[in-house]
Design a protein with these regions (language model features):
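Non-transmembrane functional regions of envelope-associated proteins
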Residues: 2, 11-291
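Short, Gly/Ser/Thr-enriched beta-strand-loop segments that form substrate-interacting elements
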Residues: 294
Length: 294
């Protein structure tokens, strides 16, 4: 009888320990889930440092041949062409040269939001007090915007637009983007990053561009830019990120198909050959949080 009672006590003790272990495990899961949802700065900073370390220890290999060429505005360019900003006629010539070289998409991460002060009609006002006759001749010449717009019409050009928090009375915004979106899932559009206002290129330029893409990026808490929006709401419109729009134009895809839910984007499809998935918080990290599949 004594042995039987001892065994019963052992069974009860084992059961109590088992329930205690389960409660501790459940508590840890709830705490970790709360931390993940809260995402305090300390945790985010640690995650960012880990990401940077992964970039250094296992960077994406650079291919021997890349389909992307960067035309940089560097010191050599400034020494040859002159100080910034350059006349729009320079960009018109650049577009023509790139188009003739066979570029399937010519992408500018520059905002052409204001009129070119070096355009002949605009420059005429500065010469008026000096030589009215020369000023009158300059007003008869086409503007640099017209030259650039003509080049944009000839080739597939993507221009940038910025999302901002305050309206700018002197700058254009709200131009209808060429990209169309098809939404698969409820609440995806509402979950996108939002900017109340936008600043885009002049209508003469934006109206002739094959694409408009968002150039705005939001730094992390340490001030480093590691991610770029894949798409965002700018005012009442939805704009793709500049890289997404460049790929859309290059593949001649009219509609971007976005699947997901109120928690975010699950996948973004540009064409049967291009699917972009594994997005985190609607933003693509530079290396580790996106992939292209074919």
């Amino acid at each position: 009888a004594r042995a039987k009672g001892t065994g019963s006590q052992v069974d009860r003790s084992a059961g109590a320990v088992d329930w205690l272990t389960r409660l501790i495990g459940l508590g840890l899961v709830l705490v970790l889930a709360a931390i993940q949802m809260w995402d305090p700065p300390l945790i985010e900073a640690a995650r960012l440092r880990l990401f940077d370390q992964l970039q250094r220890s296992a960077p994406r290999p650079i291919p021997d041949q890349s389909p992307v060429a960067i035309v940089d505005i560097d010191d050599a360019s400034l020494a040859e062409i002159g100080q910034w900003p350059w006349p729009r006629s320079v960009f018109a010539d650049l577009i023509d040269r790139l188009g003739e070289a066979g570029a399937v998409a010519i992408v500018f991460d520059i905002l052409f939001a204001e009129a070119d002060r070096l355009s002949p009609p605009a420059y005429a006002q500065f010469l008026e007090p000096i030589d009215a006759r020369v000023a009158a001749l300059l007003r008869t010449l086409p503007s640099n915007e017209e030259a650039m717009a003509a080049a944009i019409r000839r080739y597939p050009v993507v221009l940038g637009e910025a999302g901002i928090g305050a309206a700018q009375a002197k700058l254009d915004g709200g131009f209808a983007p060429p990209a169309r979106f098809a939404w698969l899932g409820q609440g995806v559009e509402e979950a996108l990053p939002a900017f109340p206002y936008g600043v885009t290129a002049l209508p003469a330029l934006a109206g002739n561009a094959r694409g408009l893409g968002l150039v705005t990026v939001v730094p992390e808490l340490d001030g480093v830019v590691r991610r770029a929006p894949t798409a965002a709401r700018v005012g009442s419109r939805v704009l793709p990120g500049l890289a997404i729009e460049a790929l859309r134009v290059a593949t001649d895809t009219p509609t971007i198909i976005v699947a997901g839910d109120a928690a975010g984007i699950g996948s973004l499809n540009l064409a049967p050959r291009f699917a972009i998935n594994r997005y985190v918080q609607l933003r693509a990290s530079i290396t580790f949080n996106y992939e292209f599949t074919s």
